[in-house]
Amino acid sequence: MEIKKTAIAGTLESSDVQIMLTQGTDGIVFDLVSDVVKQFDEAIKKTINQVLSEYDVQNVIVKVVDKGALDMVIKARTVAVVQRALDIVDEPKWEVL
Amino acid sequence: MTISFHHHFREGDYVFNIIMRSIIDHGYKNLTLAPSSLTNVMNDIVVEAIKKGVVTGITSSGMRGSLGDAVSHGILKNPVIFRSHGNRARAIESGDIKIDVAFLGVPNTDDMGNANGMDGVAAFGSLGYALIDAQYANTLVLITDNIKPYPNTPASIKQTQVDYIVQINEVGNPDKIGSGATRFTKDPKELKIAKMVNDVIVNSDYFKNDFSFQTGSGGAALAVTRFLRTTMIDKNIKAAFALGGITKPTVDLLNEGLVAKVMDVQDFDKGAAESMKDNPYQQEIDASWYADPANKGAMVDKLDVAILSALEIDTKFNVNVMSGSDGIIRGAIGGHQDAATAKLTIISAPLVRGRIATIVPEVTTVITPGDSIDVIVTEVGIAINPKRQDLMAQLKNVPGLPLYTIEALQEKAEKIVGTPKPLQFTDRVVAVAEYRDGTLIDVIKQVKE
């Protein structure tokens, strides 16, 4: 699926994550900043990649500012931002949720 | 050459920066810095002094912020030596630390050097850590903003020890020396932990008349003091003494007659600092009297209950209070190793902090050995050191006190946060941590870029 518009989800509060998606042309490109980057950079990317693949998003720039969010939070924020970026907030993809 | 300072002014310290600025500007080199601890307000100038070759060695209780970060990245020539407050006293008494010049800020002194910490604009209460420097330094310089008529009493530091007195405009910022009025935490997690800590204490055999305790300064520790007060009144139990770093809620127990003596090595808040001069039962003690393992008897040897915190605890009950989850130095031993020799040592900590587990398979840095830790209290339940089967029997059937193995708590934490990648270090040692008797307990290595 194509990113229709730049979208953002989440906050910069402690234990939250803010994710921004913009149109890309060169696969999934990460720009990751995290309080726990040394321990969890790969885990964070894996979770986001999984959601992106469930929506079949292949070209996107993913900007992540993580404040130590738990995995379930990262997943929820990713679902929200993908739905916004694909402009399908009114038609949630229930099987992903 | 070794120079020393105390950290009783904490984040309100002006003296350290004034003296260090002068030492740097005079072009001194190759100094060893041996303060009782280093607070954030000292960081920038210590980093500058290291970069200019003025400071090449440090021994301290701890460090944090930009200094801890710089040391963890290898800025200092020699490894830092971290020592507990009791161990620092031991090291000074035994000559392991030889202080050439001690620069001690005081909120009052007379013109001969009779000084205390209890009075004046920048009063901080007990001079506990500085008294060792005053006693053993080759040259002692007092720095003050308040010259009192001779003779000034009570004289915690005596004129017999003092070489020079320097008067400056202000020694400290009173608003930053201690926290203001300590508020009762509203954090439900901290309250739950505090209540469970209280349940552990009052259901143990140590909770009886004339018991003794030490608490810290964190939100949960303060809440424990409040819960303990209620239980002491309900059960008509009075304590013989409270020890260590003192807060207003502990002084309140003294004033209510629930605690007979407060043995005070430092004061964490204004209430505790201000009450010392009016209360003969709030006794100032020096770091050796408090916790030195090599003198003829320290107060921690008589301590029943200690409530301590932790950055990490591992399944062998080892505690880390020094390096952060990223491997960078950001803490202090303080009196942790010393107070942990209590008969009942309780670590109170949340199971996880954000995405960082507090209970881990192996701590990054061992500071206090698991053998001296008896009970871990988290918001989900407690774990008792299997070496303490007696405590197990006392605490296993207490309502509201779920008992887990430490391994079960570790698994619960990991299930919440996931499995972290191991931290990467180089082979270069940037700091060594001593146990309180002066033996090596662990090393901290430089973090990989």
Q: In which residue ranges do the predicted regions lie?
A:
Chain A
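N-terminal intrinsically disordered, cationic/polar leader segments
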Residues: M1-L97
